[in-house]
Amino acid sequence: MADDDVTAPRDIRAGGCRVLAPGDPDWDGARSVFNLLIDERPAAIALPQDEADVIDAVAVARERGLRVTAQGTGHGAGSLLPLDGIMLVNTSRLTEVGIDAEARRVRVGAGVRWRDVAPRLAELGLAALHGSSPDVGIAGYSLGGGIGWLSRRHGLQCNAVRAVELVTADGRMLRVDADHEPELFWALRGGGGSFGIVTAIEFDVVPVAELAAGALFFPVERTAEVLRAWTDLLPSLPDELTTWVAVIHFPPFDEVPAEVRGRSFAIVMAAFLGPESAARDLLAPVIDLGPELDALATQSPSALGTLAMDPEQPLPYRTVSAVLDRLPPETIDEVARIAADASALTLVQFRHAGGALSRVDAEAGSLAALPGDVVMFGLGLVVGPGAEATVRARLAELASAVAPAFAGDYANLVEEPADASAFFDAATWDRLERVKADWDPDDVVVGTHHVPARARA
């Protein structure tokens, strides 16, 4: 469809969903995403206020020969296919939040971010299985898996989901769960947003009676020493303790705390479901190295949202990630050398997985577990002439250094278009394609890391 087939801002039903076309006053704001290198150019953008608006948006898209894709907060937008001929359904206005503390159950609209929920849960002594940034949208995070500080004890966020509300490709509003359309429910929990436009999800949260969390800061020159101590420690750690090591090059900005401003550190981050004294005993081999800063303390669960020190403002960046069966000792010196290069990389991070993330539950969704015990993530800011090539080269070096331990990929951390079949075993991928064919045979709904409809024999 040509761009001029979608006219100026208009209602697609009386009092209904507003649709933007290229050139409309609010167009650029509605298509903006977290990664400033991504320039999304959909055919049209729908701005639904409620479920009825989403139904209308899908209907109009189909009438005009457009496909549809959902986007709430703009994280992970780089993994979408080109948006030619696609209506972007901007779900950021679907912000309803309901918390049932007694049932330990939360229902959120598709535009809700973790920052809108986590502090309220903490006041109730509860926590969700959110990830490293409070700015990330709950729906997209949950559909793609979801690993965070409590995941070694409680598993993937997608498997804490108890119901999904969505508009299907043929315009029906459904609520699916283990008893209602269980095969579609299975696909949605880990298979992403290719099966319908999700309007809300409902998920379980967990009690947190006591939490110790914080970070141990070492000068970046000690990265190899820190990584060796950390990897030696991992086999002895209980599921209640999650640790990450991150090499971070802090910018020289006034907003950055003076203690770290303009400096580079190897940081051991930890979250423990228990008392600080026990956490310190478990982490003794690392603490005994003598960190420059020790910020481990008893915390509220709300502190988990900022523990990783992720940026909350949009940035221009490229990333690389991988799930590893381990961090091999023979790679540590090379990894430390690459991570220390502040001219190309801002962050190199290794997350301890394992625990509940490695165990397959019979009731799990399409992403049941991770294939390895360590998750690697690297990020470089692309600023200035030649930066793109420099950052990509250094990220490729990092990937090559850990390649001997490569066990698979985790979709939520892959921020470029990829063959989504690589995220699943053959049997799971076959099943996902069949679910897609049952619910969207014309491949109208496009997800990040898209699952296509399997051609029928």
What are these regions (language model features)?
Residues 1-457:
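Soluble FAD-dependent oxygen oxidases
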